[in-house]
Amino acid sequence: MPRSLKKGPYIEPKLLNKVMVAQESRSKRVIRTWSRRSTIIPEMVGLTLAVHNGKKFLPVFVTENMVGHKLGEFSPTRTFYGHAGDKKTRGK
């Protein structure tokens, strides 16, 4: 269920501070975060955020199309190796 409009989007306060400092200084440094639950806001557009996927940090360059989505949507946590297949050769 989506968050109530009267509450507004959730952004980790520490992450918001880092984003505001990066915007003021026009820094292109990567901002590392564990906060996958934070919503992408327009102030983040143009920044690169390294989002933790449980094992490592994956760089995510934020574009206008990502505004309103969560950071975790762009950092997959699971690796799909394919379904277990039939090991026998198939026909001639």
Curated annotation (Swiss-Prot):
The keyword Lyase does not apply. Keywords: Ribonucleoprotein, Ribosomal protein, RNA-binding, rRNA-binding. GO terms for biological process: ribosomal small subunit assembly; translation. One of its GO terms (molecular function) is rRNA binding. Protein S19 forms a complex with S13 that binds strongly to the 16S ribosomal RNA. PANTHER family: RIBOSOMAL PROTEIN S19P FAMILY MEMBER (PTHR11880), SMALL RIBOSOMAL SUBUNIT PROTEIN US19M (PTHR11880:SF8). This is Small ribosomal subunit protein uS19. It comes from Desulfatibacillum aliphaticivorans.
